[in-house]
A protein has these predicted regions:
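Membrane-embedded beta-barrel scaffold of Gram-negative outer-membrane proteins
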Residues: 18-62, 94, 101, 105
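Short loop/turn motifs that connect adjacent beta-strands in outer-membrane beta-barrel proteins
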Residues: 33-36, 88-94, 107-113, 277-290
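Extracytoplasmic gating/loop element in the C-terminal half of outer-membrane beta-barrel translocons
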Residues: 205-290
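Conserved small/polar residues in nucleotide/adenosyl-binding loops
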Residues: 1-5, 294-296
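Transmembrane beta-strands of outer-membrane beta-barrel pores
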Residues: 43-49, 85-87, 100-106, 193-195, ...
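Outer-membrane beta-barrel signature, preferentially recognizing the C-terminal barrel domain
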Residues: 4-38, 64-89, 178-184
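Conserved small-residue
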Residues: 69, 88-179
Length: 296
């Protein structure tokens, strides 16, 4: 005899509520020198409360997984600044503008019922575990892993024993990076002379890290730097461990795979020419402009 039944997949939480946010902004706008110079500034602080999380510890006798609960607070703080200058000299006109935006965020509270005191995030290889975490006192989803102290005489990594118990385990993991930049910035240059015009735009970021543990699979995603600077008997001062190393699971979750993500690049260059109206009117066109656009 077979019986069919249904049951809730998780417990009910009658106290669950919407997340809330409070934000304070202080701004300043300034124009000077007959509008040739402009400046805009904005400082902000945003507090988000009662974040909904689900990694909650409950007794086994409950029979189900725990319901989501309001268990976290986050603070984001920073400022945004934009300045520009424009002028002309005869038939030549130009403008220069730049902007910068900073961001500092921190998890200010996480309910003690959250399993392990943190929420584990993304994984690279399931067997290696997660490499990011949401934890009180740290930036949102910071990179968490092992720290390589040095390479031994065989080219294997020696990890830092942060808890001092003589063995390397998950308790030795520490903050090894963060994905969010300290600040982002952009720069725009424009110039025109008679019928020609040019604009250049670039942007960048500073202080963000990139975790590239997928390079752990050297067959498919090998980085040239790791290949060139790998340990060999002829290269004892190498930066990276030897291929087929021991403790590969820990090495794949270590700061060996954290790279500086700061960058600046030119994203767009545009060159244009506007035909004189006395030419275009002859073919019944009010305005005609051709341009060459490069996206990088």
């Amino acid at each position: 005899m077979y019986k069919r039944h249904a049951q809730p997949s998780q417990l009910y939480n009658p106290d669950l509520k919407w997340e809330t946010s409070e934000q304070l902004n202080i701004g300043l706008d300034l124009r000077a020198f007959k509008d040739r110079f402009s400046l805009s500034m904005d400082w902000y602080k945003k507090k988000t409360k009662d974040l909904i999380v689900s990694n909650i510890i409950i007794p086994y006798e409950a029979g189900n997984s725990a319901a989501p609960m309001n268990a976290g607070n986050v603070v984001n703080e920073g400022f945004e600044l934009e300045a520009s200058w424009r002028d002309n000299i005869g038939d030549f006109s130009y403008s220069v503008s730049g902007n910068i935006a900073t961001l500092k965020n921190e998890v200010t509270y996480l309910d003690p019922h959250v399993s392990g005191g943190r929420i584990e995030g993304s994984t690279t290889m399931a067997s290696n575990g997660s490499f990011s975490a949401f934890e009180e006192g740290f930036p949102v989803w910071y990179f968490r892993g092992y720290q390589v102290d040095h390479l031994n005489e065989n080219g294997d990594p020696v990890f830092r024993d942060n808890d001092g118990n003589g063995s390397i385990n998950a308790n030795d993991k520490a903050m090894i990076g963060k994905p969010m930049p300290d600040f982002t910035y952009g720069l725009t240059l424009t110039a025109s002379y008679k019928n020609f015009d040019l604009s250049v735009f670039g942007n960048g970021s500073v202080g963000n890290d990139v975790f590239m543990s997928y390079s752990y699979n050297r067959i498919l995603y090998s980085l040239k730097e790791m290949y060139d600077q790998r340990w060999t008997p002829q290269n004892l001062s190498a930066k990276y461990a030897r291929p087929q190393l021991t403790n590969a699971d820990k090495y794949g979750l270590s700061d060996a795979y954290v790279f500086d993500g700061s960058y600046f690049r030119i994203k767009q260059i545009q060159l244009g020419y506007t035909f004189p109206k006395q030419w275009t009117k002859k073919i019944m066109i009010d305005n005609l402009r051709v341009l060459s656009l490069i996206h990088i």
